[in-house]
Amino acid sequence: MQLPVQLSPPLALAVLSIAACQIALVWWFQRKRTNPLPPGPSALPFLGNAHQIPLQYPERIFSQWARTYGGVMYLRLFKKSVLILDSVKAAQDLMDKRGAKFSDRPQLTLITDVFAFKPMMFTMPYGDLWRRHRKWYQASLESKAALDTYNAVQETETCTLLSALVSEPEHFADQVKRFTGAILLEIVYGHAVTSVKDDLIRLSDEMMTQAVSAGSLVATLLDFFPFLMHIPEWFPGGGFKREGARVRHLMRQLLDVPFNEVQQAMLEGSGKACLTTYMLEEQAEHGDLTPDDVDNIKGAATLLFIAGTDTTITSLLTFFLAMVLHPEVVHKAQAEIDRVVGRTRLPGLMDRDALPYLDQVLKEVYRWNPPVPLGIPHQVRDDDVYNGRHIPGGSMVVSNIWSMSRDPDTYEDADRFWPERYEGKSPDELARSDPRRIVYGFGRRLCPGRFLADSSIWLAVARVIATLDIRKVRDAEGKEITPSAEFISGAVSHPKPFSLDIRPRDEVAAKLIAQ
């Protein structure tokens, strides 16, 4: 059968192209109809679900919603699609197994454009520059050979921590900050810390305090309404620019000062091996350093210092809070260390496998108060389908790590601090219940410093328990003051300020600390 009209080849190609586009559009709309969005609470026009999310402890309302809508929920914040993952399985299925699609990062306007946290891997979109930073971290933080080189500084700083806790127990939180900062500054810059008043530790602490004070509301509004960046400082709501300028000034110092010290030491031939010298030397192999190269090295070094410091401090302060509330845990862990290690030396990293109860204590610290309760959001690159539900490309993906750490199917009586929950489990059950599989994130954006952080925390915990008694302080009438197990709402979940009494267990422990 002949067509009544003969089409020229170019015209025929155009007609076929239009027809193909129409078929594709029909298929796409049918796909949208046959694959509904994940369930979630009803949204309002314009606002979406923004009015339903509290500024304080949003992870808790997400956890409540998950009981109704399941482990994968869809929200809309203004015009932005947001996927809340309340299930470990969903987080692993999407971010671990579909990393090519789920490893991007949403625009974090306050952090990148106002605070100038850049170029830093945690704010970068998934791409070549991100891979470059990741390669630097992997070489320095994820191989056993590299991690072994840090044992000496970890050993030294834990001994310094013990002495400081005994001499100034009332300032234990400052000593924890010094301990954490000292390890990271030595590893990142070859910078030796001799005091809690170290300039770089003070600078980092001040910068993080100022950044947190800017508030999550400003961050949310800027991310969804970037035009707010253009309002003047004097305009109502423009105060974030003044606060941002202070943070930016402090961040500039953190980027420049330690890096310049390292460069100067290298020029003088007195540079110490550290992450920054490694990155400089590695980059020099590819030619002269460009200004972009220098900026990237500064950003990679600074990120490891500030991010590693804040989360490690949180875990150690959570440990102290748990121990003052649960002296029976301290006594049980002390008995294990005494039996395995003895009283003539301090426990070391080589003892870790022989101290299972101590490892349970640390697992429970991570689970009881995950340092970053909602993780750092990912972004979906392209449309996807999961369990028959449509996931729009460009959606922000938030992992509710806090809720995952309280999954009743895995953790009975989840609000209770109870290291014994990990006893008597099969290898599969132990792997499934280990909170370290969730607290450091998921997929290709898994925290690269997790092994260093975990070993530093373990060594500090082991040596504190081996040598010190942690007790409640007493008031003027001699009554014990029991601290509250409460945590500050925010990107990082710090325990609310509390007091405790720290003393050597006995004369044997005091001598070990003094050595």
Curated annotation (Swiss-Prot):
Heme binds at C447. Disulfide bonds: none annotated. The keyword Transmembrane applies. Keywords: Heme, Iron, Membrane, Metal-binding, Monooxygenase, Oxidoreductase, Transmembrane, Transmembrane helix. Its cofactor is heme. It is an enzyme of class 1 (oxidoreductase). Its main location: membrane. Its EC number is 1.-.-.-. CDD domains: CYP64-like. Pathway: Secondary metabolite biosynthesis. GO terms for cellular component: membrane. The keyword Signal does not apply. One of its GO terms (molecular function) is oxidoreductase activity, acting on paired donors, with incorporation or reduction of molecular oxygen. Pfam families: p450 (PF00067). The chain crosses the membrane at residues 9-29. It is found in: Membrane. It is a single-pass membrane protein. Cytochrome P450 monooxygenase that is able to use delta(6)-protoilludene as a substrate to produce delta(6)-protoilludene-5-ol. Belongs to the cytochrome P450 family. This is Cytochrome P450 monooxygenase 67. It comes from Postia placenta (strain ATCC 44394 / Madison 698-R).
